A protein has these predicted regions:
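Glycine- and aromatic-enriched mobile tails/lids
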Residues: 5-8, 87, 93-107, 111-312
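An anion/pyrophosphate-binding glycine-rich loop and adjacent beta-alpha core
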Residues: 1-75, 85, 132, 136-138
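Active-site-proximal helix-loop elements at catalytic-domain edges
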Residues: 60-85, 200-216
């Protein structure tokens, strides 16, 4: 709100969100995005891409507010929590061939534990994931399908279509997303995350009562179950990692410091023999391209440092 730039890099990250959060909590907010210094051609390009492709509702929203990028700054805020490669590597573990830990299962894009690479990265990683998967399939002989398992899964997936007096999927999804925002949103605390786990377990009963009237609602019903699983995984992984890391994304008030001696590792989840989620550590592999110490700590140094004059 003072009209001063406070971070070096505009690319979003957990540390950027931490500095953003600090500004809001310190009373310096709101935080604004300034683009009125850009050339008219650049602003038109932003509007053309953002308003017609990436975020169609953004143009209508700003028009309704009377915000003109050429003369007005855009008020910004921290978005709600998300799990899509949250800090650049938070999806299904894959190796350099896009193989997961499940033999024959491959993953690419934002659901894989890969750095941010957007559309071009999805194309590239998806290409060699497909090539490697095809090579794997060519070497596997056809096996007999278990029809009883198939029928059981079909019955589970299509169950909402047979529930005439159930709950609308969008209502259960809204309730679940509120739980995520209320109990998993950083800053994180053990107490809130444990309550969240309890709520995620309870909402399984609501999911069983979801009703679907058409294929679209059936899809939404299936998505609610997936969202619930992701919420539980996020809570358990956050409880397991007893430190703070990646700026605001994993800031725990009960463990506010980064602890490289114990937690410079991957925190993974798997199912045990009873189907329950369990956490374990996986070592970090050596960097392909070594980085120096300045690069290693640059992530934590996004705030612009001001020279403070000493009093006489």
């Amino acid at each position: 709100s003072k009209g001063e730039r406070f971070i070096e890099c505009d690319y979003w990250s957990g540390q950027m969100m931490w500095e953003f959060y600090q500004e809001l909590e310190s009373g310096n907010g709101p935080v604004y995005l300034k683009v009125d210094h850009l050339a008219e051609e650049t602003i038109q390009t932003i509007e053309e891409i953002l308003h017609t492709n990436e975020r169609p509702s953004r143009g209508r929203f700003h028009e309704g507010r009377g915000t003109n990028y050429r003369q007005d700054m855009v008020e910004m805020h921290i978005s709600e929590i998300g799990f899509c490669s949250g800090h650049s590597a938070s999806g299904v573990w894959v190796n350099e061939k896009a193989e997961t830990s499940v033999k024959g299962l491959y993953s690419a894009g934002d659901m894989a534990a890969v750095p941010h690479n957007y559309m071009l990265g999805a194309f590239t990683y998806g290409w060699f994931a497909g090539v490697n998967a095809a090579q794997y399939v060519n070497a596997v002989e056809d096996s007999e399908l278990n029809q009883s398992e198939i029928e059981a899964e079909k019955a589970r997936i299509f169950a909402p279509l047979n529930c005439s007096e159930g709950l609308p999927p969008e209502q259960v999804e809204y309730k679940l997303r509120r739980f995520v925002n209320d109990y998993l949103q950083p800053p994180k605390t053990r107490q809130k995350m444990e309550i969240g786990l309890k709520r995620f377990e309870e909402i399984k009963q609501d999911i069983k009562r979801i009703s679907a009237r058409n294929p679209h609602e059936l899809m939404r019903a299936a998505e609610v179950s997936f969202i619930r699983d992701c919420a539980e995984m996020a809570a358990r992984a956050s409880l397991f990692r007893e430190e703070s890391r990646w700026g605001l994304y994993h800031y725990r008030t009960d463990f506010p410091q980064k602890n490289n001696s114990d937690w410079f590792c991957h925190a993974h989840l798997k199912k045990d023999e009873h189907g329950n989620m369990v956490s374990f550590k996986k070592p970090i592999e050596p960097y392909v391209v070594p980085i120096n110490q300045d690069e290693a700590v640059s992530y934590d140094r996004l705030r612009i440092q001001k020279d403070v004059a000493l009093a006489d």
